[in-house]
Amino acid sequence: MISLNIEKTFGFISKEKVSAYEAEVKAAQEMLEKGTGEGNDFLGWLHLPSSISKEHLADLNATAKVLRDNCEVVIVAGIGGSYLGARAVIEALSNSFTWLQDKKTAPVMIYAGHNISEDYLYELTEYLKDKKFGVINISKSGTTTETALAFRLLKKQCEDQRGKETAKKVIVAVTDAKKGAARVTADKEGYKTFIIPDNVGGRFSVLTPVGLLPIAVAGFDIDKLVAGAADMEKACGSDVPFAENPAAIYAATRNELYRQGKKIEILVNFCPKLHYVSEWWKQLYGESEGKDNKGIFPASVDFSTDLHSMGQWIQEGERSIFETVISLDKVDHKLEVPFDEANLDGLNFLAGKRVDEVNKMAELGTQLAHVDGGVPNMRIVLPELSEYNIGGLLYFFEKACGISGYLLGVNPFNQPGVEAYKKNMFALLNKPGYEEESKAIQAKL
């Protein structure tokens, strides 16, 4: 299970200040548990891990097997929370070069519907021309522009290449239980469907079929993922004392740093496989907290790569930042630095050391340098990359986000600002019903 260390923040805020949040955190947790806070229609994620049945997981695994048995490639069509959670888990657990391996134990997973790039979609459809592919269409409404557009293209291509009957078997819809374009299409075509619960918002949906089905198709153990999340649900429960509750401490610490003028949180990893965990985290916290002219800005870096781009700014730029480092305790493989007789690169002092030891010293050295440079640091230790640990990490961030949003004084479960660009886009595209908006926006151009 993960652990949290906040000691490297105490040169900037006091332990007593963090402890003083206990009453506020308790109130926030009660709002979550009793459903008395804003956004209480979207609390289905709170006890989701412990409520997922074995039968539900078996159904997901059976459907995943159908896709694995009948597809070389599976396209996950979704945007935001409809794909980021799945991608975060899949990329964290996959071999870095799965794409290039000749022997594959699961279909190649590709993502679509998360942009409107014509080149991306054209190149994807070209790649799929000689492939046995399937699609997981993830959309509660079925009318989200990016995803609906991609699915329209992929549905037609799948039917043209594989025939309607096979397409019916290898297209799965994850959507609303009763309504929406995706539900209507799925019922009409006879697709296998899974339900997105009404009370779970997209960015909190990784432990619903939204995330679990693609993760299972990719060959990973969703039973263990859910078990890790369920254990973290207990560890972060409202009955756990404040000082022992990692989600409570993380939420309190980041809010105290925010109140002390630290407006930007940078999520740091020293393992490139965690890149999409950071992308998922940015949406989770950005959409949950960025409203009412408030909110910590969530940013991320992949070290040591980004030490050669963002390192200068972090070390000596404006002191409005703090870092949360995901530290990986144990890696999967072992590789030692070889001895070289010529030693032209001067690296013989590392000969015989594991590459991971070099990476860990880079991590420690970076943390010390950044703290000395005025950047508070929190550290989340992940024992190893496994389904169980990743499940726990995701739930930890979700629970802390709910608490943190209420500490901040916002509704953590809505995202009204996301609609602004859509209204402008629809007006510019002359979508029926947007005539007045179209006139108004044309006057601005």
Curated annotation (Swiss-Prot):
Q: Where in the cell is it found?
A: Cytoplasm
Q: Name one GO molecular function term.
A: carbohydrate derivative binding
Signal peptide feature range: none
Catalytic activity field: alpha-D-glucose 6-phosphate = beta-D-fructose 6-phosphate
Q: What is its EC number?
A: 5.3.1.9
Name the family the entry cites: Belongs to the GPI family.
Q: What is this protein called?
A: Glucose-6-phosphate isomerase
Q: Which organism is it from?
A: Bacteroides thetaiotaomicron (strain ATCC 29148 / DSM 2079 / JCM 5827 / CCUG 10774 / NCTC 10582 / VPI-5482 / E50)
Q: Which gene encodes it?
A: pgi
